[in-house]
Amino acid sequence: MKRKLSWMCAAVIGLSAFPAFITAAAPATPPLINAEPTEPAQSPATQAPVVAQTTPSREVKLTFAQIAPPPGSMALRGVNPNGGIEFGMRSDEVASKAVLNLEYTPSPSLLPVQSQLKVYLNDELMGVLPVTKEQLGKKTLAQVPINPLFITDFNRVRLEFVGHYRDVCENPASSTLWLDIGRNSVLDLTYNMLAVNNDLSHFPVPFFDPRDNRPVTLPIVFADMPDLAQQQAASIVASWFGSRAGWRGQRFPVLYNHLPDRNAIVFATNDRRPDFLRDHPAVNAPVIEMMSHPDNPYVKLLVVFGRDDKDLLQAAKGIAQGNILFRGSSVVVNDVKPLLARKPYDAPNWVRTDRPVTFGELKTYEEQLQSSGLEPAPINVSLNLPPDLYLLRSNGIDMDLNYRYTSPPTKDSSRLDISLNNQFLQAFSLNSTQETNRLLLRLPVLQGLLDGKTDVSIPALKLGAMNQLRFDFRYMNPMPGGSVDNCITFQPVPNHVVIGDDSTIDFSKYYHFIAMPDLRAFANAGFPFSRMADLSDTLAVMPKSPTEAQMETLLNTVGAIGGQTGFPAINLAITDDSAQIADKDADLLIIGAIPGKLKDDKRIDLLVQATQSWVKTPMRQTAFPSIMPDEADRAADAQSTVTASGPMAAVVGFQSPFNDQRSVIALLADSPRGYQLLNDAVNDSGKRAAMFGSVAVIRESGVHSLRVGDIYYVGHLPWFERLWYALANHPVLLAVLAALSVVLLAWVLWRLLRILSRRRLDPDHE
């Protein structure tokens, strides 16, 4: 019903606008020169339909800096004339108006009128912007109306550059053929909300919509201050939504007995429920119900009901592991029974480390491993690895690469470049031998494709927790050209390249060992908690009376870990009793304040209180997170105590005093504004990237990290690997030991040879 209404609205828009859109396209195409603002040409194609005027609407500005490939600007050239942006539309909304505001600069060498910029939406031509003489070499503003009839769940705006710099004998690869699209270009959209039925068969829509590229903001509502079981249930739900949000990011504002004005999750029992549910009938089982907001029928609430806290936990696990069975306005979660225990390092978002992994398993969309064009776009593969993978003495990571490509017409310098994290690794020539062409013609692939199979050794020290493997197929394409009297013309044909799904990469031969504390591992991969994807080795320590801000910090943190692992925290344990932390073999996640049993520990390098805080600073601070200073530079040089009224937060890591293989991560703040800074940092990928070492201080100015104090090691290495690791930072000692070993070995051999010589000369001598 919802989708039918969406199409009905779109049809009304399109049918009323289509004739006027054709006639209005011409006056809308002349761009603005030198960024002089003018009112956009109005046409019925870009007006909200009458049917949508009484429904709630929202206006969205999508800048190219936000949604275009980094850095947001585009350089369209003769051999690579296409650029584009992508955006989605929520299933509970319909677009009623769309305008593309372009900022671009054409090359001064272009021929006016013959050169132009074509704008497509989902391969439908929306408008043409001819390049005029006045625009050459100057920044130009133009507005192109977009017919909302063509806006669907997933959309692509494609910009095609048609460039000419001479009348005859052009070279498409000429450096004078270019048009730059500015990162300040904006797509203005107006969305109208659709009334959605209370039907859980679409779950998690509308609470999370995969078509929406924005960070997920999902308020969590409690009747009052939640107890430990309710905190655990909310953590399970938040981590599951975080696992679905993934790269988008997530935030979970917490409200006590107060409803937000947007879609939200509500936790309630028969005895403890928000005021708006006072008249709701009592339940006799764990129930998940979708209902409308009492003040706004366009806003939906997912109410997690239960007779008691035990029911809430069961319902939360039902959301995380049984939602594929949801339908109707409510469901009863009868049972959630685990069948297999999770294993270390089995997070779904991490590359497997127990066997070789195929590239087909690493794909995130169907055509990721192929590309086409005169200059095929790079093929990218993401590798998310456990941050404690020990690669120090590795000769490289084995990768068995199978690839196919269009044969170069001649033997030239066409090649395949392989890069890791923007660092060049290796190049391979693209062959054009006749034997290979004949062999491949017998294979069930596109005619004219060559096949290559290459073993690549990846320098292991370049790998981190999040990695990008890139394959660039670079062709030396023959181009038309010449002079007016001797012109060579032909039609260039696109090249096709494919990385085989059966290509493999192998991380199964490596140990798990890491130097701690390492806040970069926590910020980028949720480590050490994410070692077990279900957080079964994690104990969260909360205040006895958590505030809304402290609860939000807990939910944001477990949501971020869920986004990094791809699995909900169904076995997370939570306590507010500091006496229990010494008895549990677990990594500790502390929210709010460090318990008294840990506060006086010498391992702590920073402490944040209401108005007073102190910090230890190292002898010498490194400027780069990847550089590990030696022990003398890490030593605490001074301890400073400051009293201030401004907000501050911090993330502190140190070794657990109860188990030398366990770690403590404390998220601290001195005020409500401090918790806001802390939550902003947890949800901001740029601020998380600034966290490293043992201390990250968060202020209004940003995040500042320190690597101070002793380090400890988590994981296991065989004795010989541990010996090499210990000697790696002491080359002089290693040289002395090597020399002594050589002398000792020579002496042993000398003694052995003397004994053998005596026996040979005197057989009777014992």
Describe the role of every protein-language-model region.
Residues M1-A11:
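Bacterial N-terminal signal peptides that target proteins for export
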Residues K2-R3, F18-P31:
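N-terminal acidic, proline/glycine-rich, low-complexity intrinsically disordered segments
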Residues A10-A20:
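Bacterial N-terminal signal peptides
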Residues A26-E766:
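Solvent-exposed alpha-helical segments and adjacent loops
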